[in-house]
Regions:
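Hydrophobic alpha-helical connector segments
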Residues: 57, 72-106
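N-terminal helix-turn-helix DNA-binding core of bacterial DNA-binding proteins
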Residues: 24, 34, 102-103, 127, ...
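Amphipathic alpha-helical packing segments from all-alpha helical-bundle domains
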Residues: 67-68, 86-93, 106, 119-143
Length: 143
C-alpha cells in the first residue's frame, strides 16, 4: 500500500487540535506538537510550512466537519417537520443530544480557542470562522 502521508498529517493535526483546545494556540508550539505526535521536525515541515499553515488547516478541517454536522442536523429536522418552529426546536434538540453524548474531557470549540487569541490569528483564519458563524445564522434564519 503506497504511503501518501495522510495518516501522518492527520496525526499531527489531531495532536495539535487537542493541544490548542487544552493550552491555546500560543501554548501549542511546533516543538510540543512534534514531540507529542512523535514525528521528526522535517516530517512536520513537510506537511506544514509554518505554524500558521497548521492553524489554517486545523480550522478548515474543523469548519468542514462542523458544516457536515450542521447540515445533517438541519436535514433531519426538515425531514421530521414542515413547521419552521418545530424544525428549529428539533435542530436544537439534536445538538443537545450530541453534546450529551460527549465524554470527558470535553473537546471544546476550536473557533472559541482561536477567538480567545484573535490577535495571534491571521485575517484568513478569522474569515473562515466568520464565514461559519454567518452560515449558521443564515441557515437558522431560513427556518
Amino acid at each position: 500500500m503506497p504511503r501518501d502521508g495522510t495518516l501522518t498529517r492527520n496525526k499531527i493535526m489531531d495532536v495539535a487540535q487537542n493541544m490548542v483546545l487544552d493550552v491555546g494556540l500560543s501554548g501549542a508550539s511546533v516543538e510540543k506538537v512534534i514531540d507529542e505526535a512523535d514525528v521528526t521536525k522535517s516530517t512536520f515541515f513537510y506537511h506544514f510550512k509554518t505554524k500558521h499553515d497548521l492553524a489554517a488547516a486545523l480550522i478548515e478541517r474543523y469548519a468542514t466537519d462542523d458544516r457536515h454536522h450542521y447540515e445533517d442536523a438541519m436535514e433531519k429536522a426538515e425531514q421530521l417537520s414542515r413547521d419552521p418552529l418545530q424544525q428549529l426546536l428539533i435542530f436544537v434538540g439534536l445538538f443537545i443530544e450530541m453534546t450529551d453524548k460527549l465524554e470527558e474531557p470535553f473537546p471544546g470549540c476550536l473557533y472559541a480557542a482561536y477567538c480567545y487569541q484573535s490577535g495571534a490569528i491571521s485575517i484568513d483564519i478569522m474569515s473562515t470562522i466568520k464565514e461559519m458563524m454567518l452560515l449558521w445564522r443564515a441557515r437558522v434564519s431560513e427556518t
